């Protein structure tokens, strides 16, 4: 009797166990929810409700589901902030192309990018045309083209001038002999120079000649140096210069004058003559201004250090040269600043002392010339070691208010040119990669049918040979 009862009891128990096991396999979400429910009871912590299946949700009333709290959907892709905003040229990309994504990750980092990895955010302030931002000079070094370097005092021009004669990769490099201040920079196979600068032709137009002097002097000087048989060919003059933060430049010039520099041999030629002593008086009675204090340096109202960058880049003939009675001061300053901006914008190239690597990048892309060694950014200078208070700094900015406006304009134009050139280069590289991948795909497409036909021919030949043998 007991054995028969055990057999009848065993059958429903096994059936129930089978149903439970099958239910777990058919509905695994129930298992997880049941186990989670048991864990919640043990831990006493509240957990968010599981999202039901669409079938169960369809069976429930609509208003009931609207009242229930819903979990947000899982984010797709990386979280916000992990990558930058896509560039405009990325909008026409094929998002499903894995080769494009892999190659995008292989870009070299910007040497001047911040160490934390965040991209520097540049907000343009001035509106420039595409022509103003696009700078590519078809410099013909074998022809008659000449690069003219306008060297403004204390802007890093000496270092940049040495780069021009010693650091450019050329077919015929400049010949610089030890003990000589000037180098010989001849065109390939000719005895003519392609560079007009302190370290190639010397101060042929005067010590630190400005824009007014160079534009009236350089063409005549180069015609004398050139061969008469080449005078029938056209010649292009490409003017370049370097600018610097006005406060740092002013302090550097003060320290230089304090050590005995004068530049009193400068000609300051304008409209065919040099200024009279009344038009351009000196700030010191002796041979030099050695040991001058910063206060004395700033107190001289006709100190040429004031707004030097604007004066050396402007066309002084527009304001009567150095004759301050030619027009009122306000009108004179407006004309000088606007003239300096226009001349700077129309130059073939200008660099900034504070951005050495970007200066090198833009020069190389503008003239299609490569430097041998990279430029170095020296942040410790004599000007940086000068400790001045806020009042003295403000006074220097007031004395150089025209240079301050010019530098803001120049820095904005410089940054826009840099980003524009980078963008164009990035687009060209991307187009080149696309073309290479397209050629590879076409090559594979033409190669595979030939291989298939070759394989078919081999199989047919083997089969026929076997039939012959049979």
Swiss-Prot record:
In this chain, composition skew of type Acidic residues spans 88-113
Gene Ontology cellular-component annotations: Golgi apparatus; membrane
Q: Which residues form the active site?
A: 208 (proton acceptor)
Annotated region described as Disordered, given as residue ranges: 36-121, 421-453
Among InterPro entries, the record links this protein to: Heparan_SO4-6-sulfoTrfase, P-loop_NTPase, Sulfotransferase
Q: Name one GO biological process term.
A: heparan sulfate proteoglycan biosynthetic process
> Where does the protein end up?
Membrane
Record: residues binding substrate: 181-182, 198, 203, 208, 256, 263
Recorded hits in Gene3D superfamilies, A to Z, give: P-loop containing nucleotide triphosphate hydrolases
Positions annotated with a glycan in the UniProt record: 116, 127, 230, 323, 328, 379
Q: Which residues lie on this side of the membrane: Cytoplasmic?
A: 1-4
Spell out the PANTHER family in the cross-references: HEPARAN SULFATE 6-O-SULFOTRANSFERASE 3, HEPARAN-SULFATE 6-O-SULFOTRANSFERASE 3
Instruction: State the name under which the record lists this protein.
Output: Heparan-sulfate 6-O-sulfotransferase 3
Say which species the protein is native to. Answer: Mus musculus (Mouse)
The gene is Hs6st3
